[in-house]
Amino acid sequence: MEAKVEEKEPEPVENAGPDAPVRLTPMMEQYIEIKAANVDSLLFYRMGDFYELFFDDAVAASAALGITLTKRGKHLGEDIPMCGVPVHAADDYLQKLIAKGYRVAVCEQVEDPAEAKKRGSKSVVKRDVIRLVTPGTLTEEKLLDPAQANFLMAMGRTRGDGALALAWIDISTGTFRVAETTPDRLFADIMRVDPRELVVADSAFHDEELRPVFDLIGKAVTPQPATLFDSAAAQTRIQHYFNVATLDGFGQFSRPELSAISGAIAYIEKTQISERPPLMRPEREHEGGTLFIDPATRASLELARTMSGNRDGSLLKAIDRTVTGGGARLLAERLTAPLTSPKEIALRLDSVSWCLSEQTLCEALRLELKGVPDMPRALSRLAVGRGGPRDLGALACGFEAAGGIASLLDGALLPDELAAAREAIEKMPAGFAAHLDRALADELPLLKRDGGFVREGYNSELDEMRALRDQSRRVIAGLQADYIEETGIKSLKIKHNNVLGYFIEVTANNSGAMTDTDEAKSRFIHRQTMANAMRFTTTELAELESKIANAADRALSIELAIFEELTAEAVAHADSIRAAASALSVFDVSTALAVLAEEQGYCRPHVDDSLSFNIVAGRHPVVEQALRRQAANPFVANDCDLSPQRDGGDGAIWLLTGPNMGGKSTFLRQNALIAILAQMGSFVPAGSAHIGVVDRLFSRVGASDDLARGRSTFMVEMVETAAILNQAGEHSLVILDEIGRGTATFDGLSIAWAAVEYLHEKNRCRALFATHFHEMTALSEKLERLSNVTMRVKEWDNDVIFLHEVAKGAADRSYGVQVARLAGLPEAVVNRARDVLHQLEAGETSGKADRLIDDLPLFSVMLQQEKPKPQIQAKDSELANAVAAISPDELTPREALDLIYKLKELAGKA
């Protein structure tokens, strides 16, 4: 955005008496008019080199940004609050506001103040909103996370049957996808994509069935007029946006999908106003093509971020070895949407296997990939008029790296996925790449208005203008030397002032050489006579002066024209540029997963359509790396076999018992993560893995209160368990941890017992079920597909040692008291707990609390002091020393008898 001179603010339209309300100035009236059309956004109102905010916007922005709140004029007798941010730093402030959930309308001066003055002294410079900045429509580099997609999502719904669909777009890369959904899957499908903003029809926003989903999403939901989602008008809107006469080449879309696509495009047009980001054609996702993971499972497994919202500690962070922004985003996309087709999974695994077999070549590929900038985002910024020279430079660097990669791969026998990627790279616009290389300078400025980004020699007129601009002194000195030689006046000078501009000055005594002849008079034009000097100009000098004065402006004008020319060429090649960039991301992900597999000792999983789930020596990918960083004991690998026990049978259930801190939750999670890694196309942390495709993954591991919705921990647990039991099928994988622990013991045991029976008889799926209710191990005698396994421990000197090994069998104790002692509970509390436990285990309470209180007085803990640790006394030490000094083999019978009496005496003194 180029700075413009701020116009002088006109006087108020009317100045009434001191007791009457003061009318607003024309400028403030303009502000209020524009603000009225953007009530849901903070208005950045351009005034010279600042964006100003007024009234409530100023109060909100000053608090959010930590900037000074001041005032400007009055309205209805009250001061008008005002704050402002400099234009050159606007992106930094926008980033903070967007992060806090605000939307911003950017209002620019759309004419020069000089033009406004021509309409009258009270005229205000024309302004208009050129863009609405919202969380889902960002393109600026500073506002985006290079490793994360920035999706805008729209929900479409048809009248009558209420069918639903979702369309999501990342305008920073052009990605555009659409898929049908259902009310019960809606929240899960939204959270899988994890959009920054969700736009819905205002009628749907207030729908009682859907509103709970929108309440969970919160501020990210933006209601819009229902007309934007009209499926009947969608075809025309799509044709207009993509500038096509028919949608035959786009494939078939259902009515709700057309509604969602229409809503997404309409919102982009609304926020981008005059700009039209180039988008890929909408790609339809088919139901069942990806592994269904509900939001609770995504959260508990910490796939992309931890429960506390951090990326560090997540599975994505643990497996990410990518070196490009596009590769990082593709890896995240694959992790959050694993495949369910064994054939497609095998294609990805083949790519990783090839990279492992060609390590030298892959190291060279990764070196080239490190030089690949974020081409899709650079292209999008250029397309919407927010790009700069460095975005063109990013394309040039990307083309150069792509060329190097194509050379490295020349003649290589590649698997199908990588072969297709190489073909896309080879189709990049080589002519445009060469054009950029010729046109762009080596060092590029951030802003196009700074100039200097076109290479010397690319444009002859530009070179001339630059020479005049940068070398005016040398040019003037050369012309002065020519005039001295021509006139013979050695004291002749070419000077400059603000009145005459450039002029020739000679002493009065030497002026005759320039005035004595008609030829001289026509050559040297008299400008001014001084007391001791005369000043002249020439046609040549006047033209040079004009050129020098205009050279800087003309040079910048030429550069800006070249910039627009290159930008238009880039947009014209958008499809091939994006295809090449996507191909580079595929190579980045494949080589990164190969590096991960080699570094961490992962194996290639065998994935098919069976119900098998046999993991040998499996490890938790995140915990294992954390232990290595801490130089702690190595991770203990464990097997897990949930495969059918006979051909044609259903998957098995493992009932896992064992102590607290024994590793049950880690074991449960690691098997879920191994399934996800395998189906995203990655090698897995195991000795071997045979996995029948999982279509739905459910994990209920850990729970917390949902106070905002009035739900206790136990209620949250029951809701999540209900969702699992109602949705899991034979191809599902279910991970359940400690069901029923949030209520009374017998209630919890009953619920857990019934849930396991239901999983076995009704869902008939592969499942891991961890519990502290040891009574449940009896189910193995009743349920043929259920096996008991336990976390092994070793007891030593009243302590417990956790071996973290899974073994056949059942635990008979939870070792909770020992864990409490390890956690640092006061010794008196631990002792009291041990006594209570012994009484309960002995069955002496007969279920009556009063008898337990009688046997073990509760308040005695508070009255008794902790026993001091035994201290070694001097006499004890003397006795011990005497015993230690004895040499039994050297004593005579008489000496032995005397020694006994001596030791007895010492013992008596002690």
From Swiss-Prot:
| InterPro entries per the UniProt record, alphabetical | DNA_mismatch_repair_MutS, DNA_mismatch_repair_MutS-lik_N, DNA_mismatch_repair_MutS/MSH, DNA_mismatch_repair_MutS_C, DNA_mismatch_repair_MutS_clamp, DNA_mismatch_repair_MutS_core, DNA_mismatch_repair_MutS_N, DNA_mismatch_repair_MutS_sf
Task: Quote the cellular component terms of the Gene Ontology held in the record.
Answer: cytosol
Q: Which PROSITE patterns match?
A: DNA_MISMATCH_REPAIR_2
The protein's superkingdom reads Bacteria
Where in the sequence does UniProt note compositional bias of the Basic and acidic residues kind? 1-11
Entry keywords, A to Z: ATP-binding, DNA damage, DNA repair, DNA-binding, Nucleotide-binding
Q: Name one Pfam family in it.
A: MutS_III
Question: Which GO terms are recorded in the biological process aspect for this UniProt protein?
Answer: mismatch repair
Q: Name one GO molecular function term.
A: ATP-dependent DNA damage sensor activity
Please give the NCBIfam families that the UniProt record associates with this protein.
Answer: mutS1, PRK05399.1
Assigned protein family = Belongs to the DNA mismatch repair MutS family.
Q: What is this protein called?
A: DNA mismatch repair protein MutS
Species: Brucella melitensis biotype 1 (strain ATCC 23456 / CCUG 17765 / NCTC 10094 / 16M)
